[in-house]
């Protein structure tokens, strides 16, 4: 399994009901591992690759 993220390379922002977290990966993002990483870390997490090649972008509910 490829490394998920490097320490210090992620940040969180909070909107009204949804939060977001970027993971800076050491390898190019792949769709299914990104989805799995977000859903395993956050109960309501949805993952997509991008906007950069080495990023996984997670969106999840802040209220859960």
Curated annotation (Swiss-Prot):
UniProt signal peptide: none
Domain of life, per lineage: Eukaryota
One record GO biological process: killing of cells of another organism
InterPro entries hit by this protein: DEFL
Keywords from the named record: Antimicrobial, Disulfide bond, Fungicide, Plant defense
Disulfide bonds: 19-62, 29-49, 34-56, 38-58
Disulfide bond in keyword set: yes
Membership in a protein family: Belongs to the DEFL family.
Protein name, entry field: Defensin-like protein 123
Top-level taxonomy: Eukaryota, Viridiplantae, Streptophyta, Embryophyta, Tracheophyta
């Amino acid at each position: 399994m490829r490394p998920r993220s490097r320490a210090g390379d992620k940040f969180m922002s909070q909107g009204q009901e949804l939060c977001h977290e970027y993971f800076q990966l050491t390898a190019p993002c792949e769709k299914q591992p990104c989805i799995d990483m977000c859903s395993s870390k956050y109960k309501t997490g949805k993952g997509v690759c991008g906007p950069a090649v080495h990023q996984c972008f997670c969106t999840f509910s802040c209220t859960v």
